[in-house]
Amino acid sequence: MPLRFTKLTVEKKQVMKESHYLTAQPANHDKKVIVGMSGGVDSSVSALILMQQGYQVEGLFMKNWDEDDGTEYCTAKDDLADAQAVSDKLGIKLHTANFASEYWDNVFEHFLAEYKAGRTPNPDILCNKEIKFKAFLEYAMALNADYIATGHYVRRGEKNGEPLLLKGLDGNKDQSYFLYAVGKDEIAKTLFPVGELEKTEVRRLAEEFGLITHNKKDSTGICFIGERRFKDFLEQYLPAQPGDIETLEGDKIARHHGLMYHTIGQRQGLGIGGLAKYSDDPWYVVEKDLERNVLIVTQGGQHESLFKTHLIADNFDWVAREKPTFPLTCKAKCRYRQSDQECTINELADGRVEVSFVEPQRAVTPGQSVVFYVDDVCLGGGIINVAFNK
């Protein structure tokens, strides 16, 4: 039986500071919102909140990977069942859409190309740009929606009439790093109901209203890999090229199965041990020599070779869709959940940018994204080409 709403109470935490950028989102019974229903607790509660706010709410489950390929990497069938159960509980219609073709063309092929080139990409960022905030948005607009909504822990703001992407108020769950490539026009058409909440509050609301997803484990990793070993998945698409593992001094100490299976700062899975010449301290990846197909390692997670003061990045996406004025002093993240790092951005003659950090950064990884902030505002970001010291 669909829920009958009385009053939805959301506890405001002391840590949830107010922002002068925030846009008010009054209830509007004439506005139709389609929520991206993933089968998780965040999108479930997003739909719940929007219904309480008076919107006309419908859901959409996106199939972005063909789980019928015989590998069963995805949990799409279970997720769809959960999304349907929540939709039934809320009394809303659930649409389904197959974006597997768009995902393959615009996300997965790029993912493979980056790994083949020896870099470590983040497909979730491209998925947000090309699928969740493009294909999904276009699909929803064709259904005469006024907005889409997602369960991302970010907020929508405004300054001088321009949409802004803000960090989520729960610092431990903020997902703005993954949404930096989404433009202002898409942000203006999107609602982020759980961006104002802490994760514990989201789960409390889901349990209070009897949603099946209230204790569902958060999804981790890449959808199309799921619980399988990354190496097992990748070798189905890219041929492995084994090579030597060397120390910084050039000693050959082991063999690797392929550079694409390793990333800067990696400790696990190197297969190095029992070397009489060296201590038992763990080994870490410090560099991938693509020309020689050699993995370079060192002992000690705080070794100076793991730290860089500068990086060069390209392929930028600015939320405002206009690049800022350089030089720009701001803060940056080189990986998800990293604390904001003070830096200065300078534009190079070839259009790339050089980022100079106040403090050396550990394990800066080519192929990953560097994302820039001023206070809570996400400016945008780009793809790391190379990291170095001056």
From Swiss-Prot:
Keywords for this protein: ATP-binding, Cytoplasm, Disulfide bond, Nucleotide-binding, RNA-binding, Transferase, tRNA processing, tRNA-binding
Binding site residues for ATP: G36, M37, S38, G39, G40, V41, D42, S43, M62, G151
Disulfide topology: C127-C223
Cited Gene3D superfamilies: Adenine nucleotide alpha hydrolases-like domains, HUPs, Translation factors
GO biological process: tRNA wobble position uridine thiolation
Region (Interaction with tRNA): 173-175, 335-336
E.C. designation(s): 2.8.1.13
GO cellular component: cytoplasm
SUPFAM superfamilies given in the database record: Adenine nucleotide alpha hydrolases-like
Enzyme class per UniProt: transferase
Keyword RNA-binding among record annotations: yes
Record InterPro entries: MnmA-like, MnmA-like_C, MnmA-like_central, MnmA-like_central_sf, Rossmann-like_a/b/a_fold
Keyword match Repeat: no
Spans traversing the lipid bilayer: none
Functional note: Catalyzes the 2-thiolation of uridine at the wobble position (U34) of tRNA, leading to the formation of s(2)U34.
Protein's UniProt name: tRNA-specific 2-thiouridylase MnmA
